[in-house]
Amino acid sequence: MASHANASGGGGDEEMVEASTLRHRHGAGKDANGVGTERQLAAAAAEGEEEGPSSVERAFVDRAVPSWREQLTVRAFVVSFFLSIMFSIIVMKLNLTTGIIPSLNVSAGLLGFFFVRLWTAAIERVGLLRQPFTRQENTVIQTCVVAAYGIAFSGGFGTYLFGMSETIAKQATEANNAQNVKNPHIGWMIGFLFLVSFIGLLALVPLRKIMIVDYKLTYPSGTATAYLINGFHTPEGAKLAKKQVKELGKFFLFSFVWGFFQWFYTAGDGCGFQSFPTLGLQAYKNRFYFDFSPTYVGVGMICPHIVNVSVLLGGILSWGIMWPLIRNKKGSWYAASLSETSLHGLQGYRVFISIALILGDGLYNFVKVLIRTTAGFVVMMKKNSTLPVSNNGSPMVATEAISFDDERRTELFLKDQIPKTVAFGGYVAVAAVSIGTLPQIFPQLKWYYILVAYVFAPVLAFCNAYGAGLTDWSLASTYGKLAIFIFGAWAGASNGGVLVGLAACGVMMSIVSTASDLMQDFKTGYLTLASPRSMFVSQVIGTAMGCVIAPCVFWLFYKAFADIGVSGTEYPAPYAIVYRNMAILGVDGFSSLPKHCLTLCYIFFAAAIAINLARDLAPSKVARFIPLPMAMAIPFYIGSYFAIDMFIGTVILFVWEMVNKAKAEAFAPAVASGLICGDGIWTLPQSILALAKVKPPICMKFLSRSVNAQVDGFLGN
């Protein structure tokens, strides 16, 4: 699911922490500084290549490169389909619980490699194997799977799309009229995703040679994925992959069985191990407890240590200090008659202060990446426009040596062209269909809003893709938030501005995100000798799979769990209410905020910028200990229970690294992926049991001594 410009690796850390910001392609298995272990290996490979003696492609020189059609095999897409379902369920669960989605690249790559190896071994045994499993086919699988489960993230099921629903709207008193509400339905969701998810794939296709070959943008995540795949297809890499899959399977089984065991004790609200007051009843009341979730222990093992510590610090600051103090102001700062879930009461402080932190962090990183992108682009243009001149004034022949790897990769990358007419014509055609069709789904979203979005989208997509190539940051969610404010304010409250803002966010995020993702895939394909055509086709097929699979998975959750999206439940969908309230702010302004809430928002907005600035200016040894504002913002709204899970995960990883660093780097991502996948897949049978009205037989609940005495007295009477 990074070699960042700042020494602290902060950019990668920030991307690990918000569902709308964290990209699934960024850095699987990062160390304490936020640098992916895959990327460290990729960097080492790059350094070795520059030195000369080490060459990746010389190791594969005796293996024929299949044509782009041969890279697109039936078995690749069959395996991709089933893996896409599995990872879509996992991402959907993460989306609807806390919104923290770690990179699942390692598990996707491992399982794709393992299942096709299994397939080919079985066919080879009966003598029917026609085509061996190649790294190009492996790249096709990886691209297809990540594109498919990426829709579960970028489709907005935990953010803008679900934020339109009545469930989320009725938690606020503003803009909850029919004009600003649209309840989920599988039909229009699939249609919407098909309309907005493909146009981004066409936006930057003509620029792939410029971005990958001419500018030689690094795309660290794409490079890391390619290095992983190249490693699988060496004898040593295949042996390690087999061991990693074994560890993943072991912890997958443990996590799945544990989820099944826990289910027996959840017969009512507040029952089961997930409501265990491990730190005491008062701490439990303030959402400090360990909920025995393998998922977030696994997430903690994948996320950098600073992310996990930042989340815990955010929980302590908010639920340990701020909210109890503000609760004491009940009757003064807000009406005593209001419930804690009212946005005019304590809940308003929780939601809007977290929004202030997210926006401050997002604005800072947007400006920083924009400056770096512009500076890098200017330097690149100057470099390319300078003509070397000899002493007599005539042009010199370039003497820069091209390595064997670069020469071979460039030759094959430029071999299979994607016609520009397909890209330009496809963009115009899909845009025209979207402009005509989207207003049928959202009548409030006028055709000229969509036209304006599509006119500016390619420019923004280029900025995002170029920035991601330099820094590995994808700011798709930031562009989406800008769309919320711009289009929401343009439409106005009386014309369904909240719904317009959320829908425009989806349009903009989908274009900008998929364009950047495709360029990452082209970089992976470039480094594994996979054809750009096969990469493009795989991305299109994966996106089409995701447009059907993701809404179906969400619909399963939506129908199986009645309280989805409600604060304090198993699936609170925290970012759905955050995004909706951003849209309300864009339309109505700050008039609805509780007393002193705006002042606190200003303080935390400024604090987010100041903390980020301190991280960038401080020496790397100091910067890596400065917390991340985006990570701190997450528990402000939903509580600290998952922060404790993640902290336990980071402690396990830290101790493992102290005992045996090499083994931890090799197997920790696989163990973490097993914990996440097993618990995530248990959600599928749990949903089926809920739909079949099969209820758990036992309620395990914890009471204080006084309440227990009252219950005993009541039962005695």
Curated annotation (Swiss-Prot):
Annotated spans, Disordered: 1-56
Molecular-function annotations in GO: oligopeptide transmembrane transporter activity
Transmembrane segments: 76-96, 99-119, 144-164, 186-206, 248-268, 306-326, 351-371, 422-442, 450-470, 482-502, 536-556, 593-613, 636-656, 671-691
Subcellular localization(s) per the UniProt record: Membrane
Any single Gene Ontology cellular-component annotation: membrane
Secretion signal span: none
Keyword annotations: Membrane, Transmembrane, Transmembrane helix, Transport
Membrane topology: Multi-pass membrane protein
Pfam family membership, one: OPT
Function statement: May be involved in the transport of nicotianamine-chelated metals.
Protein family: Belongs to the YSL (TC 2.A.67.2) family.
Matches recorded under PANTHER family: METAL-NICOTIANAMINE TRANSPORTER YSL8-RELATED, OLIGOPEPTIDE TRANSPORTER YGL114W-RELATED
NCBIfam families in UniProt: OPT_sfam
Protein name: Probable metal-nicotianamine transporter YSL12
Species the sequence originates in: Oryza sativa subsp. japonica
Annotated gene: YSL12
